[in-house]
Amino acid sequence: MAPVGDKKAKKGILERLNSGEVVIGDGGFVFALEKRGYVKAGPWTPEAAVEHPEAVRQLHREFLRAGSNVMQTFTFYASEDKLENRGNYVAEKISGQKVNEAACDIARQVADEGDALVAGGVSQTPSYLSCKSETEVKKVFRQQLEVFMKKNVDFLIAEYFEHVEEAVWAVEALKASGKPVAATMCIGPEGDLHGVTPGQCAVRLVKAGASIVGVNCHFDPTISLQTVKLMKEGLQAAGLKAHLMSQPLAYHTPDCGKQGFIDLPEFPFGLEPRVATR
């Protein structure tokens, strides 16, 4: 981490990766803030960015001081359709725009305390699971993208996708911004929920415009690396290149099925015995 107050021009994400740097991200916001009483289990939505900005800011700062090079906006499940899902009505009470704007402002404030970049993130949507059209789903992503562009995030992440088709739509929507795009799927070695292999998922994401591809959230570090290896092999076989990314779950999941930890009987409140300690 750069010294606090260092104001040198920051290198972009691709400049860092192309030079051989290993870039460390942050993560785990939803679970960490749920345990601290700021996120409601079930909806897992990020209205705390508006209602409790000091809590979100503090967690960003903890990641920065631990060595993170990227502050990811706390916009997981911050699409308009998700914010009004499951009776939570955040979109009605606050508005998706305010949640996304607040998350961007907090991430930038903390990133500028060091040499960190800000990544604006979108994730899977209820619209896709409700079988809405590609046009309708992309519209949801573009609503968040408008805020990310207004707040001038450094790059974009499409994360936590169980279906590669939706992930491709997200990448295509984000790529129109002209900013670098990373894409991660919450899959294991068996692939996405339609049976598309990790290698093919990676190929489709890169062809859609992602410069960085990988996995996140549903499986532990060991299984996540196995899956990333399959992605790498798929890209090599297709003659494609991309940087690789892994944001594993911080719980051991050797006995999980295709959907990872969410299928465990311990999910979500009894996972502590599975914690992957330092």
Curated annotation (Swiss-Prot):
**What is the reaction catalyzed?**
L-homocysteine + glycine betaine = N,N-dimethylglycine + L-methionine
Where, per UniProt, does this protein localize? Cytoplasm, Cytosol; Nucleus
Activity modulation notes: Inhibited by dimethylglycine and methylthioacetate.
| EC class of the enzyme, as a word | transferase
EC number(s): the record gives 2.1.1.5
Q: Which residues carry this modification: N6-succinyllysine?
A: 40, 93, 98, 232, 241
Name the tissues where it is expressed.
Answer: Found exclusively in liver and kidney.
PANTHER family xrefs = BETAINE--HOMOCYSTEINE S-METHYLTRANSFERASE 1
Q: What is this protein called?
A: Betaine--homocysteine S-methyltransferase 1
